[in-house]
Amino acid sequence: MSQIHSFIPSNASPATLGISLILCGFIVYSVSKMFGYRTNHFPVEGRTIVVTGGSDGMGKAVACQLAEKGANVVIVARTVQKLREALEAIKGTAQDVKKQRFHYISADLTDAAECERVIAEVTEWNHGLAPDVVWCCAGYCEPGFFVETPVNTLRSQMDTVYWTAANTAHATLKSWLAPIPPSQQVPLPQRHLIFTCSTLAFVSIAGYAPYSPAKAAIRSLADTLSQEIEVYNGARAASSRNAAPPADVKIHTIFPMGILSPGFDNEQGLKPQLTKELEAADKPQRPIEVAKASIQGLEKGDYLITTMFVGHMMKASALGASPRNSIITDTLTSWLSSLVFLQVIPDLRKKAFNWGLKNGVPSSQSK
């Protein structure tokens, strides 16, 4: 302890220490962004990738960028016409359309049996091999005050946000983790299961009561799976193993903020005015920007991936027991965010109080 104290001036004030900490956080964050990474932990060329919710918005942008990098892409959504149109756009971005393969599947992912059908169909289409990557992008947001929202909407949001992801993950992992005997085991690259969450899972905002809990549930599921998956990875690593899964698996979660899309336009029409005021700092990104930042995070090997600096600060404020991307960067940024959110959280509550003081009890007329 004496060595640590020797680095701290005896007359340093709390303000000085706080400013120094903030500067350190910004320096570490900037350096990490400047120098990036050397190893690509997410090579996709020649690999088969399933993107749910791939007919528009972020999912479509993700599929296009993966195709541009040489992946074989399967998109999943409900509406056949939108899937057909999206698939043509995805083919148009392909690195080599003659070598790559593309497919779409219409399915209702709130039904677990449909998710199992999707994985089975992709496996058959992929010459009997399970997909290498499954990226869960399905879901939409219906904002509103909790008491003003019908209970069936609360349930619907859990179905379309959480259960589409959980059902897809369950079907995928059942396929990936089925043990095979040593005689059938061949070297396979690491597989990736990717969830798409929201920064609202870190810091929720009034008006997102139907949506935020479902996203928080995804984050919790991903954290749990990041531990459970190591049981299967460990079984593969055993020197005297018997039956084991055919490949290691890694879990990732993406945390975008606002995304400019048809779904966002619909969301804005439902959103309480208070919510719009509280999230004024959230500058929506284009789907292509979110997809690019997400893929860059995957290529770095990150577990929790945010797509802009504000989201990074929100993540740092709520790391909890989640695995860190970088012990040093995440720790310093969490110290910085703890100072920032000493101001932010009371400010959000104060604005909500003042909004009620001015507008009265929320109702459908206040939207």
From Swiss-Prot:
The gene is ksrA. Gene3D superfamilies: NAD(P)-binding Rossmann-like Domain. One of its GO terms (cellular component) is endoplasmic reticulum membrane. It is found in: Endoplasmic reticulum membrane. Pathway: Lipid metabolism; sphingolipid metabolism. CDD domains: KDSR-like_SDR_c (cd08939). PANTHER family: 3-KETODIHYDROSPHINGOSINE REDUCTASE. The lineage of its organism: Eukaryota, Fungi, Dikarya, Ascomycota, Pezizomycotina. GO terms for biological process: 3-keto-sphinganine metabolic process; sphingolipid biosynthetic process. The chain crosses the membrane at residues 12-32, 193-213. Its main location: endoplasmic reticulum. It catalyses: sphinganine + NADP(+) = 3-oxosphinganine + NADPH + H(+). Catalyzes the reduction of 3'-oxosphinganine (3-ketodihydrosphingosine/KDS) to sphinganine (dihydrosphingosine/DHS), the second step of de novo sphingolipid biosynthesis. Belongs to the short-chain dehydrogenases/reductases (SDR) family. It is a multi-pass membrane protein. The keyword Cytoplasm does not apply. NADP(+) binds at Y211, K215, I259. NADPH binds at G53, S55, G57, R78, K82, D108, L109. Its EC number is 1.1.1.102. Keywords: Endoplasmic reticulum, Lipid metabolism, Membrane, NADP, Nucleotide-binding, Oxidoreductase, Sphingolipid metabolism, Transmembrane, Transmembrane helix. The active site is at Y211, K215. A motif (GXSXG) lies at residues 53-57. This is 3-ketodihydrosphingosine reductase ksrA. GO terms for molecular function: 3-dehydrosphinganine reductase activity; NADPH binding.
